[in-house]
Structures are given as structure tokens and as C-alpha cells.
């Protein structure tokens, strides 16, 4: 009887029933709303719950749960998907920590397609993409480029070694070190001392005479801002389309609100019998009160499971932005 009551309530959610129609619930789920759901999807969902109740009444149930949404964030990377299921992208540009050490730069591949769908021209799209992910070269970058580096002592071989590391770099500073360029080159061609090269926080670009502002400009040109906020041509009303689970890049301020994650889970919950495995990302400055209110909102939304993660709360995390 208890299981049949659960199934009847699931069926009511698929029909978007009124709260008073549910049995034995103090909180009621968010039903499937036909005006926001593809017709074939809600018809299939209703048919599935009709059938579940019909067969369960006749034969009983073997399993308490038969459908769930599995964790898909990391799997999606292996599948070459930007996102899977209801999980939003972590960031437009993110760095995945590798088990053997180091990081791998991952760029959302849907940005150009989305911009095309929104009606932007090819040249505008290229400008926006370059602003976000960079050009992966310093050849003609402002201030720090092949011409200015040659004047500092760089030759073709050194420029090639430096360029080879730019595609996966957090920032251009990571490619200017003795490991990437070679100790002998740094001493003989750049005039740097062993004491400088062995200093743990040595800033080679500063030692070569480049200012912080010049480094920042070259860095944005090469590695991008990692956000579309402030991009040329992009209309303000289109910014929410590119919102991610976290703030994107150094200058990004936008991110998907915590309750928006929960509302998305609540909208998907009526389609499945079990729980949804999904991380609800919170910014690093999230408070205990915000964590508390998020759990309460998830409970009121009849979400069967919820996991919160505050950015930077672990010593090591698989993705960073």
C-alpha cells in the first residue's frame, strides 16, 4: 500500500496535479508543466507512470527505485560533451587537475554555435571567442610579442618553446621559466642569474622589464579573459545564456544562482523514480546561512537528494576556473 501511494503521487506529479490531490504529503513536488515541456516528453512521462501504477497494482513491485540521474560532470569530459543532462558547465574555460600532476585546459565548444544561433556574424563571433579563450599565441600580442621578446634576447628556438606551452597555460607567466626555456638560455641570452632562476616566486617577465599592465594586456590577448562578460558585440540580454556554475575567469561576476540549480532538479524530478546526483556549486564566499537555506529550499522543492560544494573548500578539486 505504501509503495502504491508513492507511485500514485509520482503519477500525480506527471499530470501536474493540484497540491490537495497528493496523498500523505506535507510538501508537494513541482509537477510537469505542459506549457514548458516538449509535448512528446510529457506524454511519454504520463504514459510511463500510468503503466507503473497499472502493473504495480496488478503484480506488485520488485525494486523501490528504477530510474535515477547518475553523476555526469566528469564523464561528460571523456565524452567530449560540454555538459550532460541537467548539469550546467562548470565554467566556459576550466582547468582539470590530472592524476599524474599538472592541469588540462578545457574550453566550452558550444560558444560559437550558440552565437551563430543568436544571429551574430562570423567576424563578431571570432572577436567574442578570442576575447573569451584567447588566441594562444603572443606573436602579435600587445606589449609582449615576438618583436619585443627578440629585443630582450629571444631567438627562434626560444620563441618556439615559449609558444608551445601557451595553449594549455593558465597565464602567459607560466611559460616564462627556466624549465620551459632552458637554464643556459636564461643565463646566457637573457642575463638572468642562478639566484633569480632558483627563486621560487621569480617573475621573469617583471625581470625583463615588462609592467603588470603590459603583462595583463598580453595575457588577455593570448589566454583570454575566460568569460564573455565585457566581450565586444555581445548584447547584455544574451549574457544569461552563457552563465555557468561558477564565476568565469578573473573578471567574471555572473554565475547560476544556487536556487536555480535546485529548481532545475525539481523540474526533472517527476520524470524519474529515484534521486538526481548533481553538484550544486556555491561561490567561495557562500555563508553557512546560505547553505542552510539551500538545503531547506531543496526539501521544500521535493528534491530527493542534494549535494552542495563551495568553491575552494577542499585542498584539491578536479576542476578550477
Q: Model-derived features: where do they sit?
A:
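Long, C-terminal-biased catalytic regions of enzyme "large/alpha" subunits
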Residues: 1-321
Amino acid at each position: 500500500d505504501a509503495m502504491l501511494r508513492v507511485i500514485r503521487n509520482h503519477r500525480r506529479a506527471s499530470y501536474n496535479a493540484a497540491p490537495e490531490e497528493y496523498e500523505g504529503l506535507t510538501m508537494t513536488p513541482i509537477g510537469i508543466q505542459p506549457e514548458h515541456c516538449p509535448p512528446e516528453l510529457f506524454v511519454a512521462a504520463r504514459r510511463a507512470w500510468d503503466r507503473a501504477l497499472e502493473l504495480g497494482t496488478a503484480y506488485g513491485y520488485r525494486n523501490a527505485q528504477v530510474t535515477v540521474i547518475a553523476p555526469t560532470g566528469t564523464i561528460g569530459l571523456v565524452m567530449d560533451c560540454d555538459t550532460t543532462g541537467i548539469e550546467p558547465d562548470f565554467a566556459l574555460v576550466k582547468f582539470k587537475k590530472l592524476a599524474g600532476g599538472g592541469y588540462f585546459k578545457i574550453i566550452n565548444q558550444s560558444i560559437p554555435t550558440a552565437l551563430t544561433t543568436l544571429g551574430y556574424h562570423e567576424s563578431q563571433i571570432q572577436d567574442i571567442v578570442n576575447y573569451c579563450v584567447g588566441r594562444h599565441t603572443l606573436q602579435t600580442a600587445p606589449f609582449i610579442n615576438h618583436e619585443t621578446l627578440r629585443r630582450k634576447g629571444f631567438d627562434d628556438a626560444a620563441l618556439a618553446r615559449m609558444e608551445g606551452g601557451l595553449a594549455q597555460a593558465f597565464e602567459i607567466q607560466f611559460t616564462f621559466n627556466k624549465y620551459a626555456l632552458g637554464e643556459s638560455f636564461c643565463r646566457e641570452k637573457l642575463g638572468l642569474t642562478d639566484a633569480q632562476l632558483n627563486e621560487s616566486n621569480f617573475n621573469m617577465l617583471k625581470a625583463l622589464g615588462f609592467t603588470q599592465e603590459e603583462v595583463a594586456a598580453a595575457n588577455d590577448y593570448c589566454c583570454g579573459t575566460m568569460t564573455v562578460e565585457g566581450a565586444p558585440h555581445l548584447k547584455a540580454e544574451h549574457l544569461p545564456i552563457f552563465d555557468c556554475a561558477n564565476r568565469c575567469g578573473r573578471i567574471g561576476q555572473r554565475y547560476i544562482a544556487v536556487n536555480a540549480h535546485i529548481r532545475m532538479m525539481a523540474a526533472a524530478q517527476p520524470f524519474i523514480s529515484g534521486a538526481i546526483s548533481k553538484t550544486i556549486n556555491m561561490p567561495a564566499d557562500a555563508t553557512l546561512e546560505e547553505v542552510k537555506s539551500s538545503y531547506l529550499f531543496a526539501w521544500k522543492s521535493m528534491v530527493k537528494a542534494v549535494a552542495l560544494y563551495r568553491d575552494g573548500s577542499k585542498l584539491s578539486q578536479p576542476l578550477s576556473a
